[in-house]
């Protein structure tokens, strides 16, 4: 048994009370966390142990609130244990489909339409321009030409944003990479809500299209399903 799991169960007695004694752990993919599929006395679970370097960059209080709201909507795996200080998270293990569903773009579009139009009040706000400014500081010297181009894009975007249309912030996942979209029997469930916040709908929509590498046809199917999810979602992403 990995030492970090032994330490987590030692330092957090509720883990043993909920899961039972840990018996076997299989590492899973994860960038900002160590994730294990855990066989324990009371069943099988996913156990997330955050890496130390993420302590100052992720608001665990906000994540816990947003995850609970998303789970109540049926869009996320419900937590059975979450520590709002350390970020330790446990969910029940689920069966993940061996192959990506052919209609994943439609499923994901419908799910996002439901999330964005739910009216849930997520903690935190995510603004693309602020993210860009923060990233820009570290990339300025290495990628001067690319940064200049991005500056032009953001100046154009800002001019459009200030042309009279109010910013629309909706509950957003914020990190829709393929690894965070689990295809399970019954549909898609989203995991890793660490970067969730209130954001413009375009953040999740563009992120999903780019990270999943959707073709033009898949993108149309994705956006079409998004608009059909609810009447409110249709107003968030009108056809071009």
What does each model-found stretch correspond to?
Residues 2-19, 23, 118-174, 184, ...:
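An alpha-helical support segment within catalytic cores of ATP-dependent transferases
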Residues 26-130, 137-144, 148, 166:
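ATP-binding pocket architecture of kinase catalytic cores
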Residues 28-41, 46-47, 155-203, 217:
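Active-site acidic catalytic loop and adjacent metal/ATP-binding pocket
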Residues 52, 96, 188, 196-198, ...:
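Activation segment
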Residues 65, 177, 206:
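Active-site phosphate/pyrophosphate-handling residues
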Residues 202-232:
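Active-site activation/catalytic loop segments of kinase-like enzymes and analogous catalytic loops
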Residues 232-240:
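All-alpha amphipathic helical-bundle segments outside canonical DNA-binding/catalytic cores
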């Amino acid at each position: 048994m990995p030492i970090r799991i032994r330490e987590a169960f030692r330092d957090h007695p509720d883990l043993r009370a909920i899961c039972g004694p840990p018996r076997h752990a299989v590492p899973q993919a994860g960038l900002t966390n160590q994730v294990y599929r855990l066989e324990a006395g009371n069943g099988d679970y996913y156990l997330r142990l955050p890496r130390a370097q993420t302590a100052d960059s992720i608001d665990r209080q906000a994540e816990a609130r947003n995850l609970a709201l998303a789970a109540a909507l049926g869009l996320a795996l419900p937590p059975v244990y979450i520590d709002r200080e350390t970020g330790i998270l446990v969910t029940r293990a689920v069966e993940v489909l061996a192959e990506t569903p052919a209609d994943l773009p439609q499923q994901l579009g419908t799910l996002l339409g439901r999330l964005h139009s739910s009216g849930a009040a997520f903690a935190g706000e995510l603004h693309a321009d602020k993210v860009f400014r923060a990233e820009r500081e570290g990339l300025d010297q290495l990628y001067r030409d690319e940064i200049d181009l991005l500056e032009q894009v953001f100046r154009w975007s800002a001019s459009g944003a200030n042309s009279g249309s109010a910013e629309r912030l909706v509950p957003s996942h914020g990190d829709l990479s393929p690894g965070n979209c689990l295809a399970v029997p019954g549909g898609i469930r989203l995991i890793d809500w660490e970067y969730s916040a209130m954001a413009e709908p375009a953040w999740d929509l563009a992120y999903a299209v780019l990270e999943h590498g959707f073709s033009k046809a898949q993108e149309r199917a994705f956006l079409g399903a998004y608009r059909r999810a609810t009447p409110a979602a249709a107003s968030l992403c009108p056809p071009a």
